[in-house]
Amino acid sequence: MESKPLPAHHKITGRFWQTRVFENLWDTWKEPTASEIIKWMRSREPHMTRGFLLGNTAATPADFAAAFPPHAVDWAAVADPPAEAVQAVWAGHSTVLAQMEGFTFLTDPVFSERASPVQFAGPKRVTPPAFTAASLRLPALDFVVVSHNHYDHLDRASVLALHGRYGPGLRWYVPLGLKPWFTGHSIHNV
């Protein structure tokens, strides 16, 4: 059996075993050095996040509510998206329901209480998601985009809930190397 040639942005690496990886083809791209990363981190203005991300201050639920006040989803607007515009509903963290050019899709569905491989430990949600896979008014989806396999972007329970609701016809767009994870969960439209 003859293999197809790899696209230009795919690269085989490894001396003792072969691994397919993505290679950035932009001439302007360069991997930052450790000293450049440290310099960048030190240049960040601490007041931008009031210490929540780079300091020892822990954000409270009230801080989150003030920064990201919850709004009810306008399901009537979702049911009738504008033809010539992009419409998006943020569910929380990485999850967005987007509608554009006649397509309705989700990004990085995470509906679980914790961004963790287990639900008894790990970072816990401060506010519930605006909608879940079980939301009755969630429209038909054309596809789901998963950006990468961190727990706060690829949530097993949410993926399985969407697959259970929409069935094998739901298309999944995932990064290189992630298809086996989906096929291992009996999701083959990847």
Predicted regions and their residues:
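Metallo-beta-lactamase
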Residues: 1-127, 131-137
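Short glycine-/acidic-enriched loop or helix-start segments at secondary-structure transitions
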Residues: 116-117, 155-157, 183-184
